[in-house]
């Protein structure tokens, strides 16, 4: 594995996005109590990942760029004291383009961040307005420029496609903007209508209409073709990176590395159990204050571990080694996998090279269906 991984959920946003179903809070008065609680949670859960030093740190959202240098300094000091951060290879800050002012980006030079992941979502004004984002096209372009001027080359952006009314041409222009900016890593996600979001309510009321499935497929294949032609490697279903710029942090999720998540609704995994924190900020603060973090725990049996291994492995260009299946889960599971995979191999939806199964270019389009057939039920 990659050593251990640490993820911080910073649950604050200045404004809630239309499609968002992540936990976040727009009230900054909780910021200080939250940082105190997060440091206390690290102390309480120090043993969870078994004391190995951290390999990557990821500040996720909400919007961590709502925190200031002094806030980050407190958190880094605690993480180093409790887990050891000197061997960290990648430290990522998730940021909104409109938070990336010249002063803010300059202040990051005093902190150990070496990667920025920016929630651009689109370079089109109408998309940004529809998604209820705070930034505009100009701010997104400027934010990327500021990072580069301040020596941060390792930049990732998120893009969303499949918006109501989106055309193929608009999506191509978005991708061309990203390529032209020489952004070395791009994560692209299809818009999802999650129950409970403002977007879902608009769909229910008939005010927005999801795009046709044929167009979704065309947008996805355009994404793959455009970025591959431009020199990006399609290393995970939603992720594209230039060589040397894959996200080590995300790769650790897909390779079964232990990780600890700190903060409301953060998830953790140590090979034997999955844990996730309560999403309510007041309840989270209360639990930490009492010295009893409010955590749900799922102990993982061998079948769940096998299913996790299949889902995470097949999402990547590295795929699944059948020898690993035999070694980790026994011969019965290996035989089952080979039987279940046979049809897809014949149809050219899975590829087998040496000992490794990967999705073919065609297979990527129906990956969910293929994966569910390979699972142990």
What do the predicted segments below correspond to?
Residues 364-377:
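Short, amphipathic alpha-helical interaction segments positioned at domain boundaries
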Residues 1-6:
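Short, small-residue-biased leader/transition segments that mark boundaries at the very start
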Residues 356-360:
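Minor-groove-contacting beta-hairpin "wing" of winged helix-turn-helix DNA-binding domains
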Residues 346-355:
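A short, conserved structural fragment
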Residues 331-343:
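Short amphipathic alpha-helical interaction segments
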